[in-house]
Amino acid sequence: MYILELLLKGNPAPIVVHQKEEEAANRAYQSVVNALQSGSPQSLELTCDRTGKKVFLLTGELCGVQMTTKSGGPGAPGTRPGFLAQLQG
């Protein structure tokens, strides 16, 4: 499972999108990066494979994106990769 975390301006909690396939996760990540690099606000729709839910947002409100891999094994308690883990440290 691949996880995309999208950070919105003024919102401390990320929007999380799960993708089962690495290729689909890379495509979604690249579409967010391309939209951010364009410099002009665009609309973007992403689908979460885990729940089948969709999110639609304006890229002008995004300030970052991160892609991580979720392994099947248990992680260390109380730790998590990503933006929020860096802020808590």
Curated annotation (Swiss-Prot):
Q: Where is this region: Disordered?
A: 69-89
Known InterPro entries for this protein?
Answer: UPF0367 (IPR020885)
Disulphide bonds in the chain: none
Q: Which HAMAP family match?
A: UPF0367
- NCBIfam families annotated for this entry? PRK13683.1
Q: Which family does it belong to?
A: Belongs to the UPF0367 family.
What protein am I looking at? UPF0367 protein CYA_1023
Originating organism: Synechococcus sp. (strain JA-3-3Ab)
